[in-house]
Amino acid sequence: MYYEIATMTLPFSTAAQAAGHVQAFCSAPEAGGELLGCWFTDIGTLNQMLVLRGFPDVARLQAERQRTQDGGNAFGCGSIYQSLTLDSYRAFPWMRPVRPTAESGLQGPVYEIRTYGIKPDGVQPTIDLW
C-alpha cells in the first residue's frame, strides 16, 4: 500500500471551507485514491490541514499526484491555501492498511501523526528489526 500526506497551510478560519473542497476533490469520479483522513493542527504549527490518502500501487499514486498538481486548484483549495507539500510513503510489508477499521485498531477523532527518516540503505535493516 502507498500513502500520501498532503499538508496545506491555510489562512485562519478557512479550515471548514477547505475540508468541504477536499472531500469533493477526493470523492470525484476521476479520483484515483482513497481519502483516509483529514486533520487540522492545534498543537505545533497551527493553521495546517493534513490530508491522508491511500493507493493500492505507485502508478495510481503518481496519476493522482498529477491530477492534484494540474490546473492550479489542488484539492479544490487553490484559492485558499498558502502553501502545499505532498509527501509519499510506502508501507512496510508487515503493516496492515492504515484506515479506521476494527482490524487496524484505529478509532476515534484524535490522532498523533509522526514521521521518521531512515538512513540511506536503512529500509531493509529497519524491516528486519521489526
Annotate each PLM feature:
Residues 7, 17-24, 57-59, 80-85:
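A generic short-segment signal for beta-strand/edge and adjacent turn/coil regions
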Residues 15, 45, 57-60, 93, ...:
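Generic "edge-of-domain/loop-turn" microfeature
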Residues 2-9, 37-67, 108-117:
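Short, well-ordered beta-strand segments in beta-rich or mixed alpha/beta enzyme
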Residues 2-11, 92-130:
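Surface-exposed interaction/gating patches
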Residues 18-21, 50-53, 64-66, 99-104, ...:
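Surface-exposed beta-strand edges and their flanking turn/coil or helix-capping segments
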Residues 14-35, 66-77, 122-130:
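Short amphipathic alpha-helical segments
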